[in-house]
């Protein structure tokens, strides 16, 4: 896990404390200190409303957080599905419906991968491809995170587009996960080998 990052702190007074952690307990070292963060105001483009700027940046941070978490969930679901595919081949009691559901989930995950990452088959042919959610959000994040200027109209519009696309993709991701859980339950009833993400059950 990387170190936490975020937008610049607002000007004002802050309190800092130094502590040592030992055996799970924190012990403060010395008294707390107050320090002041001052704006540089070195450019005419610096925002006159830093609180509003930070509010926008924090919204971008949240969308970035959800995007990264969704991508990890997507990859985890792909891994679960790969193990389920192998489990089906080793379980005679599975049905045609299980195989059909696996194929459906595989296609839905592939479509979600395009939504998040873009279509590499198009870009590899040097053709213009729609921007994936992850690329759009990453661009907004790095262009705004440490900026001291008010976000422009294009930045706000791009944020709203990314947020809308992410909401739709997240809804689909949850729906596919529900279908994946149902497939895992079906294979468990058929006596399939253990697969990641599934706790086996004892027979009655």
Which residue stretches match the model-derived regions?
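Signal that preferentially marks extracellular ectodomain short beta-strand elements
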Residues: 1-10
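Short, solvent-exposed loop/turn segments at the edges of extracellular beta-sandwich modules
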Residues: 21-25
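Low-complexity, Pro/Ser/Thr- and charge-rich linker/hinge segments at domain boundaries
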Residues: 27-66
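Mature extracytoplasmic or organellar-lumen-exposed domains after removal of signal/transit peptides
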Residues: 18-20, 33-35, 39, 66-204
């Amino acid at each position: 896990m990387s170190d936490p990052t975020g937008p610049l702190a607002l000007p004002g007074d802050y309190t800092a404390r130094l502590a040592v952690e030992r055996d799970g307990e924190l012990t403060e070292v010395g008294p707390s200190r107050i320090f002041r963060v001052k704006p540089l105001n070195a450019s005419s483009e610096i925002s006159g409303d830093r609180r509003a700027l930070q509010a926008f940046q924090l919204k971008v941070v949240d969308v970035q957080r959800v995007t990264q978490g969704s991508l990890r969930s997507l990859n985890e679901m792909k891994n679960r599905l790969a193990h389920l595919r192998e489990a089906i081949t080793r379980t005679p009691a599975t049905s045609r419906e299980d195989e059909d559901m696996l194929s459906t989930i595989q296609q839905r995950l592939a479509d979600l991968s395009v939504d998040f990452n873009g279509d590499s088959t198009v870009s590899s042919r040097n053709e213009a491809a729609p921007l994936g959610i992850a690329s759009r959000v990453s661009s907004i994040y790095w262009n705004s995170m440490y900026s001291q200027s008010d976000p422009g109209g294009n930045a706000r519009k791009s944020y709203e587009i990314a947020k809308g696309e992410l909401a739709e993709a997240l809804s689909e991701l949850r729906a596919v996960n529900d279908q994946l859980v149902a497939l895992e339950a079906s294979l468990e009833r058929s006596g399939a080998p253990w697969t990641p993400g599934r706790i086996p059950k004892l027979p009655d």
